[in-house]
Amino acid sequence: MSDQKDQMIDITVDFSGGLEILFSNQKHHALSVPAQDAQGKPANVGFLINYLCQTLMTDPRADLFVLGGELRPGILCLINDCDWELEEEDAYVLQPGDNILFISTLHGG
């Protein structure tokens, strides 16, 4: 029997609007992420954002994606094609097969 702490969830994460530059210039990522955070709570989108910064981000400019540990204003997050504001935002608990899309609306000028 496998330990619940070792369980993983298979999801896809996509980046658009220039965010892919922060993640090896790759727009689509098929990931297996821990099913629980360090406190043993079910992994949610807030956990995923931190996880992406720690494990997938290759660019040192994390502030282009997060500010103060939260998703930077101007970045849209869609959970299974729905605005995350309709899905409890960063409290949404990840489910196997979820597709999380981050889109930057920030533009230089």
UniProtKB/Swiss-Prot annotation:
Coiled coil stretches, renumbered? none
| UniProt xrefs under Gene3D superfamilies | 3.10.20.30
As for PTM, the annotation reads: C-terminal thiocarboxylation occurs in 2 steps, it is first acyl-adenylated (-COAMP) via the hesA/moeB/thiF part of nit-1/uba4, then thiocarboxylated (-COSH) via the rhodanese domain of nit-1/uba4.
User: Could you tell me at which residue positions the Glycyl lysine isopeptide (Gly-Lys) (interchain with K-? in acceptor proteins) crosslink is annotated in this chain?
Assistant: G109
- Location of 1-thioglycine modifications: G109
**Keyword Hydrolase appears in the UniProt entry:** no
GO molecular function terms attached to this record:
protein tag activity
Q: Can you say where in the cell this protein is located?
A: Cytoplasm
Q: Name one GO biological process term.
A: tRNA wobble uridine modification
Cellular component, GO annotation: cytosol; nucleus
InterPro entries with a match to the protein in the record: Beta-grasp_dom_sf, Mopterin_synth/thiamin_S_b, Urm1
Keywords assigned: Cytoplasm, Isopeptide bond, tRNA processing, Ubl conjugation pathway
Pathway the protein contributes to? tRNA modification; 5-methoxycarbonylmethyl-2-thiouridine-tRNA biosynthesis
Q: Write out the similarity annotation.
A: Belongs to the URM1 family.
Q: Which PANTHER family match?
A: RURM1 PROTEIN (PTHR14986)
Per the entry, what this protein does is:
Acts as a sulfur carrier required for 2-thiolation of mcm(5)S(2)U at tRNA wobble positions of cytosolic tRNA(Lys), tRNA(Glu) and tRNA(Gln). Serves as sulfur donor in tRNA 2-thiolation reaction by being thiocarboxylated (-COSH) at its C-terminus by the MOCS3 homolog nit-1/uba4. The sulfur is then transferred to tRNA to form 2-thiolation of mcm(5)S(2)U. Prior mcm(5) tRNA modification by the elongator complex is required for 2-thiolation. Also acts as a ubiquitin-like protein (UBL) that is covalently conjugated via an isopeptide bond to lysine residues of target proteins such as ahp1.
HAMAP family in alphabetical order: Urm1 (MF_03048)
Could you tell me what this protein is called? Ubiquitin-related modifier 1
Q: Which organism is it from?
A: Neurospora crassa (strain ATCC 24698 / 74-OR23-1A / CBS 708.71 / DSM 1257 / FGSC 987)
- Upper classification of the organism: Eukaryota, Fungi, Dikarya, Ascomycota, Pezizomycotina
